[in-house]
Amino acid sequence: MTRIDAHGLKIAPVLFDFITKEAAPKTGIDPDAFWAGVAAILRDLGSKNRELLKFRDTLQDKIDAWHLANKGKAFDLGAYTAFLKEIGYLLPEPATQKVETANVDDEIGKICGPQLVVPLTNARYALNAANARWGSLYDAFYGTDAIPHDPSEGGKGYNKARGDKVIAKAKAFLDAAAPLATGSHTDVTAYSVIAGQLSAKLKSGNATALKNAGQFAGYQGSAEAPSVILLANNGLHVEVVIDRSHVIGKDDPAGVSDMILEAAVSTILDMEDSVAAVDAEDKVLVYRNTLGLMNGTLSADFEKGGKTLTRALNSDRSYTTPSGGTLALHGRSLLLIRNCGHHMFTDAVLGADGEEIPEGILDAAVTGLLAIHDLKGHSKVKNSRTGSIYIVKPKMHGPDEVALTVELFARVEKMLGLPENTMKVGIMDEERRTTVNLKACIQQASKRIVFINTGFLDRTGDEIHTSMEAGPMIRKNEMKAQPWIKAYEDWNVDMGLIDGLPGHAQIGKGMWAAPDKMADMLAQKIGHPSAGATTAWVPSPTAATLHALHYHQVNVKARQDELTKGGPRAKLGDILTIPVSNSNWAPDDVRQEIDNNCQGILGYVVRWIDQGVGCSKVPDIHDVGLMEDRATLRISSQHLANWLHHGVVSKDQVMDSLKRMAVVVDKQNAGDPLYQPMAPSFDGVAFKAACDLVFEGRTQPNGYTEYILTARRREAKASETAKA
């Protein structure tokens, strides 16, 4: 490939052309000036980026040495804490300073609800997520195990017996979220609007109204026979759809054919953990899809029922208000964009030294450029209505790394002529050093922060790697019951409340990873809003619709007030308690643990390496589909690396399991025409990558999987090109 030279940079032609011909036009930014700005930022911040990465390694070496020096001794939390302070890992907690982030959209500062995460490599998935702001409750109940499936309800077409259960459950939700003054929504035979109030005629012939008249937010159609009733509860909206000609509405006493819930309030468009973007072509695909979302042109064709359908961004929704005015509601999820972390490098651009440049610097510059299309109103639909660009920054270790991000964003703003603090930052609290210094991290970004979020899987991966020399870790499935996990989750909310995030920023919780287990999600994920979180991650638009029910059940703002009055709950000592085990596991337990980890690693890695799929529903060892990305890979590979290092398992045991599980994964993927089996040769690039992740896991910086995955994916792509 012949690269294009610009201001000392050597740029891949596909990226150069994208910036020149697609991204820059209509922004007012000259492409040459853009590259001059990127080059200047790299000159000033590139070395600082590398110094911070070296400091990570220095701290890890010192922590390893401390554990080795104290091997065989009882763990002394006091001595350990003092040591972490001495080496600069644990910093003094700063005085409380409330955040000052301004110009945030309501989806960030006011509305509590679900958050989707979607790979930017897949246009249709990205559009589905952006459009998941509104979702059918009837469909979500009918199509999932949220209502248990009865074998008698099988067959093609609409099953009325199951439909009746769905309607009953949905009406029960409505009775709880927007109750009538008398009676139940089940008893309503007609809704109408009279003198600006919602009137509900009951089977008895009497009319009633809402218990709280203020919950009636608007309607569509005529006042006498509205086609949609809009209700509000805890900041979220519900549409009651009325259509007596519909297959469901014709049998409903009130003609109700569906309930549409405000669901995915926000969505993270991911350039990081859920994508496999290893070269300039991949990066341009990610950037091009981002551009299409920012300027409103993105569309995707797909086949359904023998027809080709086109998906595009939904329009806003319009209603008549109770007073006769017009109400417009956002028709799409507010979009945040997750850039790569400081530790990633890309060959899409080479620096003056011929080396790959920090990928996060390129991401920030390009994201800012692309978002100008939204800020300038080039799309028929707006993302931010307050003039902000929302960027989630992952895998930062401590406040100095947050400070680098803040400086980077300031430089990009200056380069692009954007007002100061236009580029907002979401801080992923997924690394141990960020957790223990979270207050200082927040304060470094006090005028930009719009998001803090816990991520159990990555955070556990860093927990294992940081304390690799402390001893063998407990079994993976026992990790969630450990004291450090609860303390970590509570600490995040505590710090968010202390620093005044409500009204300025989201406080988020992690992913529900089992998209087919919606009954379990309904039972368990209510814990996230109950913990004071304003948002939490879900794996699909359907899951977003169902998780929205929790925000109708829990008034998060009231819960946050309760927590604030109660004071901080988490203790630093619990967070620093290392989850090592003294157990002498039975051979069957060890084999089960190895097999579980190996199967999960192979099931994810084989698609990443061979097909470039960075996030997908991967069957686990029991054939339960789980959403996998690099975070799940990190914990599994680090856990095996830890057990190998401490002699709990041998290399031969792990290799035997990898080969047996490769056969299992091959069978699970037998229906995929693009799949390349790993057995019986076990010499493919994907299998080798899985082996590298385990057997080299202890020496990978912070236990990250990206370096091995990227190298092996590039190898696989080169092999494909050679064959072609």
Curated annotation (Swiss-Prot):
Which UniProt key words apply to this protein? Answer: Cytoplasm, Glyoxylate bypass, Magnesium, Metal-binding, Oxidation, Transferase, Tricarboxylic acid cycle
Q: Where in the cell is the protein located?
A: Cytoplasm
Pfam families per UniProt? MS_C, MS_N, MS_TIM-barrel, MSG_insertion
Q: Which InterPro entries match?
A: Malate_synth_C_sf, Malate_synth_sf, Malate_synthase_TIM, Malate_synthG, MS_C, MS_N, MS_N_TIM-barrel_dom, MSG_insertion
GO BP, one annotated term: glyoxylate cycle
Q: Which residues form the active site?
A: 338 (proton acceptor), 629 (proton donor)
Molecular function (Gene Ontology), one example? magnesium ion binding
Question: What residues does glyoxylate bind to?
Answer: 338, 430, 455-458
Q: What is its main location?
A: cytoplasm
General function of this protein: Involved in the glycolate utilization. Catalyzes the condensation and subsequent hydrolysis of acetyl-coenzyme A (acetyl-CoA) and glyoxylate to form malate and CoA.
Annotated HAMAP family: Malate_synth_G (MF_00641)
Q: How does it assemble?
A: Monomer.
The protein, known as: Malate synthase G
